[in-house]
Amino acid sequence: MPENLSSALETFKQQRNAAEAHYLKANRVSVFFREYTAAVETLLAALWAEHFQNSALCLMAVGGFGRGEPYPCSDVDLAVVSPAPLSDGIQEQIARFIQTLWDCKLMPSVKSGSVDELCESVRDDITGDTAFLEARFLFGNRQTADELAEKMNVQRNVAAFIEAKLVEMEHRHAKSQGSGAVLEPNIKSCPGGLRDIHTLLWIAKAQGLAANLPDLLKQRILTRAEAGMLSHGYRRLAHIRIRLHLNAKRAEDRLLFDLQPQVAESMGYQDENRRRQSEELMRVFYRAVKTVKQLGGILTPMLRSRVSSTPVRVTLRIDDDYIQVNNQIAARHTDIFFRRPEHIFKIVEIMQQRNDITALEPQTLRAWWGATRKINRSFYQNSENRRRFAGFFRSGNGLTQTLRFLNLYGVLGRYLPAWEKIVGLLQHDLFHIYPVDDHILAVVRNVRRLALDMHSHELPYASALMQSFEKQDILYLAAFFHDIAKGRGGDHAVQGIADARQFAADHFLTEEESDLLAWLVENHLLMSAVAQKEDIQDPGVLDAFCKRVQTHERLSALYLLTISDIRGTNPKLWNAWRASLLESLFHAAGRCLAGNDGNPHALFGRRRQEAADLLTRAAVPEKQQKKLWNALGSAYFARHQSREILWHAANLVHDFEPPIVRSRILPQSDSFQVMVFMPNGPRLFARLCRIFSRHGFDILAARAFITEHDYILDTFIVQIPSQHAPEDYPDIQSALEAELNSFIHGHTVAETQSCNRRISRRSRYMPIAPSITITPEEDYPDRYSVEITAVNRPFLLADMAEVFFAHNVSLRYAKISTLDERVEDSFTVFSPDLKNPKIQSSLKQALLEQLA
């Protein structure tokens, strides 16, 4: 590299470092962009002079660099423009110039050609056309640059350009769906991200308006409040993107789990109020994109309407204050929301009631949103406003869209201060994937879908139950309030009771409705916890659950709320296994509340009799049946449900001496039920678990039982790996049975801890602290409940079983609740030694070491 270029490169590095240092000190986005742009242009000037002295060509900045918005590791977008077609010699010259840019580590993205060639190249290329919309002259022949800009502007069909950018934005938003996009969002392309702000400015510039927010304010396209809020949202997002590049040392636009703590720390966020610094960062991010979405929803239709051909305008009178224009509602006088604030909810009420109205007319929306920022205590205390807000839930029609609309524009948070505290609040607990406010609205949506016949095919039984439930509005409110106290520290279910009762008192709910609402908020986790963590075949567990529930109305409401909550937490959590657990508990509790299962001994006797009837129909002699029941023992009927007993009995009754493996695919599910019957021996449970883990199965539930003649009868529910299609299940079943049969007949089975599953980035960088509780069971001497919460990983249950064995603890029952990347396991164990605090402490420490 010539000496003069080496000097220019060194100067560039110094200026770039100075720009970064000034930014980190002053924390001003505009200063960084200005100084970094100047540094790049200084280097480009030297390179241009070296390669194109006295040339007819010109160099233009396009795209983000043309906009004056260069991020630390982004491409430098350039165009080399010629007044005439490029000769071979000029093309070689341009190639050498581009290579020098790479040598200087500028990461160039360069277009080159004549004016006509470049115009033709972007005729059907919306991305290229957009890049040249940002073009600005740098060096060389200015006349050529002006000619290109003029021809581009003449060629561009403004209306078509705007429509194409809006379609592009829709596609971009559609790609930003799913848990990955929520948890590790792309700062640039996510809904409400930087690209949405750019799109707004491109639409403005394409029609001859200013291309920046201050000038759009001067042109009265934006109000002062709109310009201020949009600028604030833009600066927040730009800060995050700059810090992301600086910490990643690459052009990384996704807030990856491993980068979130680094970016948060560099921006000065601290762990506080039991929230991680990364959660604080993500909350700032979600609020910023929400602001951009708010203003985009108002400003984009307004800018579009300035140039788009208007469809035939159909206007209908609604009442003295409102008209319908096509599918939108418009206020006759937009100052009505300031003069008569009760219309802030009235217009939403009309929109909710009318299926032929889908939106507010842009100018009406703008005025309405401006008025909503005046919502205060006086507005809340107005009885008409309270009646209308409660009416949104009583109506049910369009409830999800109504609440999402009110949340997007900040109305829920202004009307209910408790709601404002959860907006954008993300929980790094390895199973929630949405901010709390979005999760709550997803749960409301799920409850509402159960009430609509058009969605009954999704969950037929739950839908039928919901459609016959009298107090649907209370269920919607329970979904709305169930997590409203998240993030305050302490038990959010208990803390939410006060919010729910205050709302009920203020919004004309009866005492009975208030009691049901408060009970559902307090107990919204009860059914999930019992179904997924406890042995519902144990009459004591069922009795305790029913004492909490007390009525069939509460049971039905809790069942419906629980289903909707799980489905709204993380799409991966809802599966046939969880559905069957909840349904089993619902029906068992229903019988218990009706008084049909009040006597445990009668229940156990009925289970035995059902199995005996089956065997009798199969012509099994009574003497043979009796031998089987004696071998299994009376405790067997207390520990297994009827369907398991029938399955076991059919397979064991003819000969219960040889080892047996049986499996069956559970109906409408991606799970197998597996039974293993063999002579008792050391570490059998752990070794069986390792076989399942090596095959990639998740163990959902396990029941370890020892017969009277010292055989194990272990029953597992295992989930088939998601990459397998249902048509593969029989082959998978055969392979699993073959290995298990080899094991039970004494053949050596490898115990290597190898499987293809990898721990996710989220688990590695956002782990949860493992926790263990050991509690004696009151009615059963030497029996203990062990509760474990930890990051999910292969072989976890096998490792836990090894620890139990090493401490002389007998595992009787395991209930595995896998919540995406988090597990909440419940074990019932037997050990006289655990009365000794030292031994109990030793067990706990050993378990923690395995979980670390």
Curated annotation (Swiss-Prot):
GO terms for biological process: regulation of nitrogen utilization. Has four distinct domains: an N-terminal nucleotidyltransferase (NT) domain responsible for UTase activity, a central HD domain that encodes UR activity, and two C-terminal ACT domains that seem to have a role in glutamine sensing. This is Bifunctional uridylyltransferase/uridylyl-removing enzyme. Keywords: Hydrolase, Magnesium, Multifunctional enzyme, Nucleotidyltransferase, Repeat, Transferase. It comes from Neisseria gonorrhoeae (strain ATCC 700825 / FA 1090). It catalyses: [protein-PII]-L-tyrosine + UTP = [protein-PII]-uridylyl-L-tyrosine + diphosphate; [protein-PII]-uridylyl-L-tyrosine + H2O = [protein-PII]-L-tyrosine + UMP + H(+). Residues 319-672 are annotated as: Uridylyl-removing. HAMAP family: PII_uridylyl_transf. Its cofactor is Mg(2+). The gene is glnD. It comes from the Bacteria. Uridylyltransferase (UTase) activity is inhibited by glutamine, while glutamine activates uridylyl-removing (UR) activity. SMART domains: HDc. Belongs to the GlnD family. The keyword Hydrolase applies. Pfam families: GlnD_UR_UTase (PF08335), HD (PF01966). Residues 436-558 form the HD domain. One of its GO terms (molecular function) is [protein-PII] uridylyltransferase activity. Modifies, by uridylylation and deuridylylation, the PII regulatory proteins (GlnB and homologs), in response to the nitrogen status of the cell that GlnD senses through the glutamine level. Under low glutamine levels, catalyzes the conversion of the PII proteins and UTP to PII-UMP and PPi, while under higher glutamine levels, GlnD hydrolyzes PII-UMP to PII and UMP (deuridylylation). Thus, controls uridylylation state and activity of the PII proteins, and plays an important role in the regulation of nitrogen assimilation and metabolism.
